[in-house]
């Protein structure tokens, strides 16, 4: 797809791993498919699976048929998962338990809330900001999500707009008829960017007002403070795939707008105290912990040695999995602990590798030559990753490329001797 021309030449020196696709007619649930022998596979697994959601399991609100077939292989006769599984999504505009219920309904398989890792889930680790007055941007259940992450004092963009009605002036229809300014509004001490908002012009304007005024948008400052207030952001996806034939703008596009405006106005770079969501190492460390805890609860004694990350977006899923694999290799060699999004965390020693598996049912398409060649007049492909992640073409090469998630699960079972 031409819109993804910036994702590097994928699959160079790699193979498109194929297995015969076996469709299950009239699949009624998430039980093992007919004829599938699971007896030998009921041993303690030494691997875990990280599933992206959009473009891998679903397109919009429609389940991809291959996902039903894949999950029929992943459960035993009692309907329990045979291996540890987490769902790692860059979405963040839904509550964790609601996303788990949505997946349960679509996949016809029980998904627990703690198996769902939203883009902002690692914000639970940023304890130093949980008691501060934070402005939150995004959509959906913003306050509920922020409080679930541990933030005790949050202010929404709409609340700020009502307190300072003179700040939001783009939409003539929404301009207030009267100006009742509040003098008792608490100072903002930081900004949470949980996902793309609905009214970008309003959010961009008010976030800038807060940053330029050091949290006092009703007064303003002669000189913008720098460093500015702490900013935590999640979901760096420039694009994402829904029902439309072409990708849609993601939160990464909103972040790009905010960064560009801030630099143009102040001459300085917008800084983040934490960037999370794929491809951040912090998100994969968080997922690794959830996988390990899941295995412990199930009584699986064997340590989890390998992770398989299955996704459709080369820049977030493949880049992130390969970056985490690189981190694991460095840690296993005893090299210095890596900095991860403003936090440092001691990595459990068991996990040794993370393999990236790219599917062709979402952002990436092996059938579209435009997604793998530079546009006319360019030698290189444009980089669709976030500004704070350097462009490393090697990290965009998937360990394996398969057609869909069913083939991905077949590949993993083959690799692990579970087929």
UniProtKB/Swiss-Prot annotation:
A GO-annotated cellular component: mitochondrion
Residues annotated as signal peptide: 1-15
Keyword Signal listed: yes
Alphabetized Pfam families for the sequence: Hydrolase_6
Keyword Signal: yes
UniProt KW keywords: Signal
Highest taxon in the source lineage: Eukaryota
Family according to the record: Belongs to the HAD-like hydrolase superfamily.
Protein name: Haloacid dehalogenase-like hydrolase domain-containing 5
Organismal lineage: Eukaryota, Metazoa, Chordata, Craniata, Vertebrata
Gene name of the encoded protein: Hdhd5
């Amino acid at each position: 797809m031409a819109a993804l021309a910036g994702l590097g030449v994928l699959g160079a020196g790699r193979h498109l791993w194929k297995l015969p696709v076996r469709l299950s007619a009239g699949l009624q649930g998430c039980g093992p498919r007919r004829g599938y022998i699971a007896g030998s596979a009921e041993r303690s697994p030494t691997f875990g699976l990280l599933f992206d959601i959009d473009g891998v399991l679903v397109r919009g609100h429609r389940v991809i048929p291959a996902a039903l077939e894949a999950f029929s292989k992943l459960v035993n006769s009692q309907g329990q998962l045979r291996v540890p599984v987490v769902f790692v999504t860059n979405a963040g505009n839904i509550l964790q338990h609601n996303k788990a219920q949505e997946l349960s309904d679509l996949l016809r398989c029980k998904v627990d809330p703690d198996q769902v890792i939203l883009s902002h889930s690692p914000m639970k680790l940023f304890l130093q900001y949980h008691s501060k007055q934070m402005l939150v941007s995004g959509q959906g259940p913003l306050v509920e999500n922020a409080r679930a992450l541990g933030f005790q004092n949050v202010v929404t963009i709409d609340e700020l707009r009502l307190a300072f009605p003179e700040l939001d002036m783009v939409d003539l229809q929404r301009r207030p008829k009267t100006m009742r300014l509040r003098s008792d509004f608490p100072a903002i001490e930081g900004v949470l960017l949980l996902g793309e908002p609905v009214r970008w012009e309003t959010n961009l304007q008010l976030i800038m007002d807060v940053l330029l005024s050091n949290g006092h948008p009703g007064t303003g400052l002669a000189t913008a403070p720098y460093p500015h207030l702490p900013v935590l952001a999640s979901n760096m996806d420039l694009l994402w795939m829904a029902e439309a034939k072409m990708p849609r703008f993601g939160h990464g596009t909103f972040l790009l707008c905010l960064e560009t405006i801030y630099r143009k106005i102040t001459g300085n770079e917008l800084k983040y105290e934490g960037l999370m969501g794929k491809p951040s190492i912090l998100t994969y460390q968080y997922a690794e912990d959830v996988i390990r805890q899941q295995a412990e609860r199930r009584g699986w004694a064997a340590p989890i040695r390998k992770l398989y990350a299955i996704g459709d977006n080369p820049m977030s899923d493949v880049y992130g999995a390969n970056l985490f694999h690189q981190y694991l290799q460095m840690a296993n060699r005893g090299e210095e602990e890596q900095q991860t999004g403003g936090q440092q965390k001691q990595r459990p020693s068991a996990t040794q590798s993370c393999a990236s598996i790219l599917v062709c049912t979402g952002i990436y398409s092996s059938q579209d030559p435009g997604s793998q060649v530079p546009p006319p007049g360019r030698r290189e492909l444009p980089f669709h990753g976030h500004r704070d992640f350097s462009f490393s073409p090697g990290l965009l090469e998937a360990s394996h490329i398969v057609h869909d998630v069913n083939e991905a699960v077949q590949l993993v079972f083959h690799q692990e001797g579970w087929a």
